Amino acid sequence: MSSTAKHGIELLHDPSLNKSTAFTEAEKQALGLVGLVPDVTETEELQLQRVNLQLAQKPTDLERYIYLINLLDHDETLFYRTVMSDPVRFLPIVYDPTIGEACLKFGHIYRQPRGMYLSITRRGRVKDVLKNWPQKDVRFICVTDGGRILGLGDLGANGAGIPIGKLQLYTACAGVPPQFLLPMYLDAGTNNEQYLHDPLYLGMRKTRPTTEELYSFVDEFVQAVQEVFPKCCIHFEDWTGKDAVHLLQRYRDKYCVYNDDVQGTAGITLAGMINAAKVKGTKLKDEKYLFLGAGSAGIGLANLLCSALVAQGMTLKEA
């Protein structure tokens, strides 16, 4: 039986506790739910059957994304049950590539708040803002400033969908409990004129500040996280290449920080290169490499590849 201080409608409005038609008769009696939900007890399999039926009626992946996010806002358990019932089918809907279209239209498809939104205008009060988050034991924050979302460029506040989606993968793929996760958007403005003139844009209607102002804002944020959530790892996601590399170097020796674009993509790609070389019967140092552009992922891979080449006997200059 569920153990919670919440009862009745309050419980049904909490997506982390709501099970809708899956509450047992004993739970309905104990939690004040009799008459508030249909008088049946469904299995998760039957609930999933209904979800799939409703998804089949959606004509596009964007509409399926909107449906699934709405499900997440009402019943977290059923959302993750759905995603993990068929990861190959659902991960491209809740994250890349569909998340790209969702971010482009974020202000237009927005339903209700998820995560936190922290504006640069709150400088000097960042710690107080973080204390507004209801969960006090946050283990991972995924944070973006919307500076370079996927391959779409500066999306500003529309990029808030990225940390939301990325942390869904933490739970769906790694089993991290959702209550330990906090999606975060740092609003330092945008240079995207289209969004600055869009009445439904949800971010600050100012162009981006100087680099020094941005880094000062991020400094306060990172320090505030150490004080409010001392067990937390900060995951930087989809910053510009310059900012991604700089912020990682700025904090990595002092705090628990990680950049998926610089480190995660690089690690996975290098692993693929190493195994491809094994299949060919060659070594990394025997190959030539072409990088298209110099984004954060490319820079991260180039640095890691150089380290791997040095490990195979080359000098850093040769690498």
What are these regions (language model features)?
Residues 1-256:
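N-terminal ligand-binding/catalytic initiation module
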Residues 254, 259-319:
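Glycine-rich phosphate/diphosphate-binding loop of Rossmann-like nucleotide-binding domains
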